[in-house]
Amino acid sequence: MVRHILGISGGKDSAALAIYMKDKYPDLKVDYYNSDTGCELEETEVLINRLESYLGGITRLRAAEGSPEPTPFEHFLKASGNFLPSPQARWCTQKMKLAEMEKFVGDEPTISYVGIRGDEEREGYVSTKPNIQAIFPFRKNIWSLDVINQFLSPKNAEKVRSIYLQVCPDNLVDPILKVLDTPLTRDFYYSKKLNALLDIDVKVFNKAVYEYLKTTDLPVGQLDEFPLIDNDDVLVKDDIFSILEDSGVGV
């Protein structure tokens, strides 16, 4: 059985994503969790507590249990030679968040929903374990980079072409095949091919990726159905604030 999880960082984007998922997909059983660093700001704790009431529960994860240091942050700060986390050494994310999430998941096939907005050009820090698949519901492209690279790889071209012919409406066959049959070059690389397919039809693209994933061991491919493939929402900063305010959780 495939698990669905969503990490609550205490930031606005992950909080809004949790509310969005609960409201838009009420039949999807999502395990919400928070990785406690022991050094959160008071307003962060207030937001998480309000969110917990709205969601009906958040599992609290805490790294470095049994450490003589008063908080997980101080434990890993000392272990790193008192070097604070930085863009080059993100031990806070790796040790206190990703590692704890991976322990929480274990070896179960799991879909992890990540709150990166549609107006952000980044992938975020996600697990590389093969049983954990990241999904980005706020973006036009909900799939992770590794999935896109597989899907658009020249070695899978015939398989993907065949899948598209199965899921594609007749009026979109020609423009989609034109994109698919255009070889990857320095001027027409993965991201351009991806955006060209998304611009034709997001939902058809998602259906094609989903059918492709059924031929792999990735978690989404193990599902009998995946409702997010019919979603073409793109949420940006203003939408995040609206979700938080309209829910009553607040910002």
Put a short name on every predicted segment:
Residues 1-251:
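Nucleotide-activated chemistry modules centered on ATP-dependent adenylation/adenylyltransferase
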